[in-house]
Amino acid sequence: MEKGGNIQLEIPDFSNSVLSHLNQLRMQGRLCDIVVNVQGQAFRAHKVVLAASSPYFRDHMSLNEMSTVSISVIKNPTVFEQLLSFCYTGRICLQLADIISYLTAASFLQMQHIIDKCTQILEGIHFKINVAEVEAELSQTRTKHQERPPESHRVTPNLNRSLSPRHNTPKGNRRGQVSAVLDIRELSPPEESTSPQIIEPSSDVESREPILRINRAGQWYVETGVADRGGRSDDEVRVLGAVHIKTENLEEWLGPENQPSGEDGSSAEEVTAMVIDTTGHGSVGQENYTLGSSGAKVARPTSSEVDRFSPSGSVVPLTERHRARSESPGRMDEPKQPSSQVEESAMMGVSGYVEYLREQEVSERWFRYNPRLTCIYCAKSFNQKGSLDRHMRLHMGITPFVCRMCGKKYTRKDQLEYHIRKHTGNKPFHCHVCGKSFPFQAILNQHFRKNHPGCIPLEGPHSISPETTVTSRGQAEEESPSQEETVAPGEAVQGSVSTTGPD
């Protein structure tokens, strides 16, 4: 063997064994260099493991000098204990009832693997929790319906649930008191829909399927009966493996006298139909149509793609649409109707139907719901993860960026940088016309617009300062003062204090 040769030695799973030994040391309380306090409970750990597992700890600006960290955002110490164990072992055992707590804690610690898994779990169980109860009630209703004579049209008293506001249910605590009514049926969309669900003709069904009527407060009852073939409406057809949700007008619940009349005196009501898949996929297909005074249906599709639901259990697109309509009363809520027979026939086809839906989506104010970048508190969706992280810090009151000179705390890194420039006097942006200096590009642009109209700032680096400016032009104009500060010629630019933190 040559003396200059290299021998490569590779031990499988050595890194896993190192983490396992570190976990044993943590359990024994040996060689731990940091203590994390969560709701009065202390957890000893190693800084290197926390920094390698969580971007929050890795980007913490004063982690090197700290021996104790207190986290007030995480309310359940057991949740943090499981997450801490995951940092060492890569395994976690969580309770299904605490899935939201794990998602909140993982979002704060920026542990993306836990966030992804919790999101997948929520998407899978969103409908299974309530659909199991609905299916049990419907099965009982079908059994009792088969034992009764066909003349019975109404539900028995033991199946009726009180719809009075005094009847509070767990579902009512979760949903807002909205004066709209959901009618859940085993129905299919109208004939104009291109839904991929399997449709059976309603003419072969003699008895009407049981109807579970639910209002937005979560109060519900089951109604069953028999409908003759001639009296069945056009929209009463069955969809296999799906439950049809229809938002109805309050006329039949509150009475015609409580129904506000429209400006044109018409009695048309808008019906929003959503088909919920009960097979556990958690997908919802949505379509709109209008019922006129004569009962004729006019197709009004608004979305052909699958709408997703938020972890909190609220229908995000529906609430966002109502909010957008209330904020912009001048916007046309009615979608475009086909202007010719050619356009109408194209809309009925699959390709034309998709193009029609895309045109309608462009006109909508609300943006598509993204379950991975959605705030778990207010269901607001974002396009970038950094924007969601900054938004979550506002909800939680997190101020991870601390000034070392005066101790002031800030939510965003750019706010701390601007504050530090007040201490250091660093003004890296210079006006080539009058020689004045400014701490931010936005203030320099404002100076040019106000004092040197027609001139533009010179491109290129303005200072040798290592500090970088991360604020956008719009943010700096809102958050930085507009006063102009002068610097004497030849004044040295002071070095800036380094700040690090989560993006």
UniProtKB/Swiss-Prot annotation:
Keywords of the record: DNA-binding, Metal-binding, Nucleus, Repeat, Transcription, Transcription regulation, Zinc, Zinc-finger
Disulphide-bonded residues: none
Zinc finger (C2H2-type): 373-395, 401-423, 429-452
Residue stretches of biased makeup (Polar residues): 155-167, 465-474
Skewed-composition ranges (Basic and acidic residues): 144-154, 319-336
UniProt keyword Electron transport present: no
Superkingdom assignment: Eukaryota
Region of interest called Disordered, as start-end residue ranges on this chain: 140-206, 280-344, 457-503
Biological process annotations from GO: negative regulation of transcription by RNA polymerase II; regulation of cytokine production; regulation of immune system process
PROSITE patterns registered for this protein in UniProt: BTB, ZINC_FINGER_C2H2_1, ZINC_FINGER_C2H2_2
Alphabetical list of InterPro entries matching this protein: BTB/POZ_dom (IPR000210), SKP1/BTB/POZ_sf (IPR011333), Znf_C2H2_sf (IPR036236), Znf_C2H2_type (IPR013087), ZnFinger_BTB_dom_contain (IPR050457)
Recorded GO MF terms: DNA-binding transcription factor activity, RNA polymerase II-specific; DNA-binding transcription repressor activity, RNA polymerase II-specific; RNA polymerase II cis-regulatory region sequence-specific DNA binding; sequence-specific double-stranded DNA binding; zinc ion binding
Purpose of the protein: May be involved in transcriptional regulation.
Protein name: Zinc finger and BTB domain-containing protein 37
